[in-house]
Swiss-Prot record:
Gene name of the encoded protein: pax8
Pfam families referenced in this protein's UniProt entry, alphabetically: PAX, Pax2_C
Keywords: Developmental protein, DNA-binding, Nucleus, Paired box, Segmentation polarity protein, Transcription, Transcription regulation
Region (Disordered): 198-217
Role: Probable transcription factor. Involved in kidney development, acting synergistically with lhx1/lim-1 to establish the pronephric primordium in late gastrulae/early neurulae.
Organism listed in the record: Xenopus tropicalis (Western clawed frog)
GO molecular function per UniProt: transcription cis-regulatory region binding
Entry protein name: Paired box protein Pax-8
Transmembrane segments: none
SUPFAM superfamilies: Homeodomain-like
GO cellular component, one term: nucleoplasm
Superkingdom of origin: Eukaryota
Cellular location(s): Nucleus
Location of the region described as RED subdomain in the Swiss-Prot/TrEMBL record: 96-144
Length: 458
């Protein structure tokens, strides 16, 4: 703060007439110059003696504002030295002060800035005028003290004892990567089993071949409809979209369409009348007695058929000898049985109604009926499955199909709540197994025959 006082005492001859003058109290002053150190000290002494500021101003011929400012600064900081208003303070971050702050911080890294300030004053490194503020100490710690910890390698080596050495990080061998060896990670399945994993080139080749096979399968489905490329957006790249489409276009079930590009398996075209003749011949060959229908696993062939407008496209695939394709409706013994080729006038190869292996559980009855009365697979204690539209079963016949057990009884119900209702509220038969609601569909209209219903006839 620049204190321009108008109460300078002294002979007028010592003042510059051009820059000075007399104040209202008759005291001489100089513009732009602070009050002399002697006058400042006299103001403080009179204040300690108990003289009022107004009396000090009259005695020393110094303005009242100057006396008040000097005394206020003295009571606050203990200093009577003049400052500069609006100017910069004298540099407090001297090399000596910075070194001391660094020493304190190294001795106690958790020391606060105000503790460092108090210690500087206590040890006499700084006085009240030269001690840095708390913000200045924090700035010194950030900019200067922390730079001492980031010393170059040469200075660090010089500070080490003769028995200590520094090893650069580049000289340390990093631990072996889990994917760096040919057997993969030690803790992975491939590593435990000793399976060699393909390298990056091998994986890239596999991915390329996989994508190529996916493209072939996508191209072969020309009748699938609108191309998926129309659904693409510019937010995705070309390769991620191809990979996603490849996984979605894969068929998880046996292929049910004919293709001219896929010539891996033999295909034959059978018309609907020819297939119906083969079905009729197959039904006529079945008898109502226990007939053992053998099979030859080495020559077993499975077929998958798809109904279109006027023709059946049946894809013939050679299946493995261990796979067993069986139809529950074509079994008459507990063993898995398939149909042999049928010798008839029309040269139609043998076929099974289902191309995929069907696992049948439970026990099969030895009762084989002709026509529609074909008994399917049943589970112990459960009613048999009767397709819709086949309601020619009597309650006694159905009761005979169900395995005997303690869960079901053929006797009439004698419960009081059941007997409370009239006969019109109950089923015609008092037995649960003879209920037409569950096991007879004669009173209901049969749905129109479909292609799947034609296979149920076998």
């Amino acid at each position: 703060e620049l204190i321009t006082e108008r109460g300078c005492s002294g002979p007028a001859s010592n003042l510059n007439i051009g820059h000075g003058g007399l104040n209202q109290l008759g005291g001489a002053f100089v513009n732009g110059r602070p009050l002399p150190e002697v006058v400042r000290q006299r103001i403080v002494d009179l204040a300690h003696q108990g003289v009022r500021p107004c009396d000090i101003s009259r005695q020393l011929r110094v303005s009242h504002g100057c006396v008040s400012k000097i005394l206020g600064r003295y009571y606050e900081t203990g200093s009577i030295r003049p400052g500069v208003i609006g100017g910069s303070k004298p540099k407090v971050a001297t090399p000596k002060v910075v070194e001391k702050i660094g020493d304190y911080k190294r001795q106690n890294p958790t020391m606060f800035a105000w503790e460092i300030r108090d210690r500087l004053l206590a040890e006499g490194v700084c006085d009240n005028d030269t001690v840095p503020s708390v913000s200045s100490i924090n700035r010194i710690i950030r900019t200067k003290v922390q730079q001492l910890f980031n010393l170059p390698m040469e200075s660090c080596v010089k500070s080490l004892s003769p028995g200590q050495t520094l090893i650069p990080s580049s000289a340390v061998t990093p631990p072996e990567s889990p994917h760096s060896d040919s057997l993969g990670s030690t803790y992975s399945i491939s590593g435990l089993l000793g399976i060699t994993q393909p390298g990056a080139d091998g994986k890239r080749k596999l991915d390329d071949s996989d994508q190529e096979s996916c493209r072939l399968s996508i191209d072969s489905q020309g009748s699938m409809g609108i191309s998926r490329k129309q659904l693409r957006t510019e937010a995705y790249g070309h390769h991620p979209l191809d990979a996603l489409e490849c996984h979605f276009q894969r068929q998880h079930f046996p292929e049910s369409y004919s293709s001219s590009t896929h010539s891996k398996t033999e295909q034959a075209l059978y018309t609907l009348p020819l297939l119906n003749n083969a079905m009729d011949d197959g039904k006529s060959s079945l008898t109502s007695t226990n007939t053992t229908i053998g099979r030859n696993l080495s020559t077993h062939q499975g077929y998958s058929a798809l109904s279109e407008l006027s023709a059946f496209t049946i894809k013939q695939e050679a299946s493995d000898s261990s796979s067993a394709s069986s139809t529950p409706s074509s079994l008459c013994s507990p063993t898995f049985l398939d149909l042999q080729p049928i010798s008839s006038g029309c040269s139609a190869p043998s076929f099974s109604a289902f191309s995929h292996p069907a696992s049948v559980y439970g026990q099969f009855t030895s009762h084989m009926a002709s026509g529609r009365d074909v008994v399917g697979s049943t589970l112990p204690g459960y009613p048999p499955h009767i397709p819709s539209g086949q309601g020619n079963y009597a309650s006694s016949a159905i009761a005979g199909m169900v395995a005997a057990g303690g869960d079901y009884s053929g006797n009439a119900y004698s419960h009081g709540a059941y007997a409370a209702y009239g006969e019109s509220w109950r089923f015609p038969s008092s037995s649960l197994l003879g209920s037409p609601y569950y096991y007879s569909s004669a009173t209901r209209t049969a749905p129109p025959p479909t292609t799947a219903g034609a296979y149920d006839l076998l």
